[in-house]
Amino acid sequence: MSAPRETIAAVATAQGRGGVGIVRISGPLASVAAKAISGRELKPRFAHYGPFFSDNQQVLDEGLALYFPGPNSFTGEDVLELQGHGGPIVLDMLLKRCLELGCRLARPGEFSERAFLNDKLDLAQAEAIADLIEASSAQAARNALRSLQGAFSQRVHNLTEQLIGLRIYVEAAIDFPEEEIDFLADGHVLSMLDKVRNELSTVLREAGQGALLRDGMTVVIAGRPNAGKSSLLNALAGREAAIVTEIAGTTRDILREHIHIDGMPLHVVDTAGLRDTDDHVEKIGVERALKAIGEADRVLLVVDATAPEAADPFALWPEFLETRPDPAKVTLIRNKADLTGEPIALEVSDDGHVTISLSAKSAGEGLDLLRDHLKACMGYEQTSESSFSARRRHLEALRHASDALEHGRAQLTLAGAGELLAEDLRQAQQSLGEITGAFSSDDLLGRIFSSFCIGK
């Protein structure tokens, strides 16, 4: 696979003024541009300081010129970088000079796209470049760097290699029936299949954690009217984002607030109080609240610790558990601890349920416990050298692969259908290939790289 032969150019540094600005060129005309702009032959992979010339030999700027002949460059093509002063006018003049020499303006992400097309990066590594640039916390940046260095891709590659080995064994048995391999009696296929499924499950769990660090966690605040949901939102946001009154049902619609906790992005959603009501508008708000609960990464179920219902909070709204079937993603918040006198604390039950006693109003007592808990849910303390950045599309691909393997196992154990297992293995391999770009449509590639910065 090779990239187009046009030569592209773009400003690679951020818009605005700065001490240094970089113009990047990639393609067959890079060597021509290097000599025309610097006025001399450039030694590959050396930094040359000097003037940058226009077509009539006027000096446009001065700085460093670096020439990287392909394939030993970022894109795999001939690459020229001009590092001058970071003023927008100077950079525009340099870019205009590149266009005069036959270059065209690069599309967003086109340099990374060419690196992918020339096998310098796989798709997950290319996406990690954008993730590293956009990282909103040190942990997210570390994860993105590990993905750029190939940590995620290597995990996917290992899974793919195991699937290929399994496919070879299964398809050989199908193609050569005279060997009379009994899949079930053999036990080899089932053992290999379960090994891949277990490893895939681990990668999917770690990818989910990486996606939370990259995209941010959606936290929905739910509970009865007047439990203190809006007060909790305001306390987390550090401002009066929601109206707070003593009137039950003040919040009737979804209210979203984007906050950061030590650089970790959270999308906090305040919802209407859960109760039966004849008010048409409030009823719509309750329906939207239940929908938001079902889509949340984490639910904070707020109860008024002074109310009798606090003794059995999960019984206060039956539809709640139906909407949020995974209790492990629900944190119980016992609010108004300043009124009950109960200690500010975080407790974990034997079954793993987390309860935090706090006061959303009284100087935010207990908020630090909640913030630390939310950071832990996002993997803030995760220091594993194997952690990596992941995107939602990666999670979908991993889930599709997992579903295919589950289906294939059922075909094998319930029906002994080796032919159907072979097809499920093929689908699982294709889903994994979509992560690294081994199997990707042109439309998908276009959407991914168009989201990059120009010059990357």
UniProtKB/Swiss-Prot annotation:
Give start-end of the signal peptide. none
List GO terms (cellular component aspect).
cytosol
Subcellular location(s) per record: Cytoplasm
Which Gene Ontology terms cover its molecular function?
GTP binding; GTPase activity; metal ion binding
Top enzyme class of this protein? hydrolase
Enumerate the cofactors the protein uses: K(+)
Q: Which residues bind K(+)?
A: 226, 245, 247, 250
Disulfide partners: none
Q: Assembly state and interactors?
A: Homodimer. Heterotetramer of two MnmE and two MnmG subunits.
Q: What is this protein called?
A: tRNA modification GTPase MnmE
Can you name the source organism?
A: Pseudomonas fluorescens (strain Pf0-1)
What broad taxonomic lineage does this protein's source fall under? Bacteria, Pseudomonadati, Pseudomonadota, Gammaproteobacteria, Pseudomonadales
Which gene produces this protein? mnmE
